Amino acid sequence: MKQIIHSFLYGSAVWAACTVSQEVKAGGIPVSTTEDGDAVSPNIVCVVCEDIGPWLHCFGDSVAVTPTIDALAAEGIRYTSIYGTVGVSAPSRAALITGMYPTHINANYMRTQGGQIARPPAVTGYDIVLPEGIKCYTELLRAAGYYCTNNPKTDYQFLPPLTAWDECGRQAHWRNRPKGMPFFAIFNTLASHEQKVWESAKDTLYVSPDDVVLPPYYPEDSIVRRDIAVMYSNIYRVDCFVRQMIDELKAAGEWDNTILIFYSDNGGPLPRQKREITEVGTHIPLIIRYPDGRLAGSIDDGLRSIIDIPPTILSLAGIKPPAYMDGKAFAGKYASPSAN
């Protein structure tokens, strides 16, 4: 469902609590500024995939076919030691929209809202209620003058407030913003989600089962080999999705004005991976590409957490992350010394 937030909401207490002020350039275009008056409104696009560990060629996986993501890594910085807080999507996405540990906001159970086949009939679903004062970080971006869109998945364990997004749904896109307005956009792809291992089982394979390397916890078996080959083929489909997102930015003349961030919500989709609090269940890839070419081709092996992504995005936008966040910014104006 497309959400349109009318102008009267901008005068609400949500905006009053933000540390970022707004000025207006000639022509009526809002521009985010810090309290010091520095312009800090780069466009930011996040491409978010599902159920992928660091099984990308640019992260050292020789089996993976990821030419677009490899090129993105060559132009940006790879974070090789970033982990989720859990091994499954909904609690991870609660963390990704708040910058909080799921346990800190009562979001650590999978799909609290219901919809789980394995849920006992007597156990009813519920929306978590965020503690007072905790917001979706996109509310702070919107307060700073950003046009914020999410396409389409939320899965936060709670319904996002109307103030979270200018648009949220399958048609949500940064192209819909008022002309000249800085944008923050998330595009989610399900191409690599767990279910695609069987849904795509008869689709084209881009990796041969004979070429995959079996982890030591799997038996030598043709079915296992094919499932892993399907997983790698789905990762290639994610690569194609990333190419589409980049091509759209380039076609609109926004590529050289946009920070692009690529990451997964949790680790792998296969047994002993997804849902497990293990290396393969929580280890994710993260790449940040800056339009000015800084840190191109570099690697950061510092220990990071998925809860660090929201404050880092705020910091990259020139917005001071709120003190309540469990995560720490590791890039941008407000990068925390303790995070580096």
List where the protein language model places each region.
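Sec-dependent signal peptide recognition
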Residues: 2-13
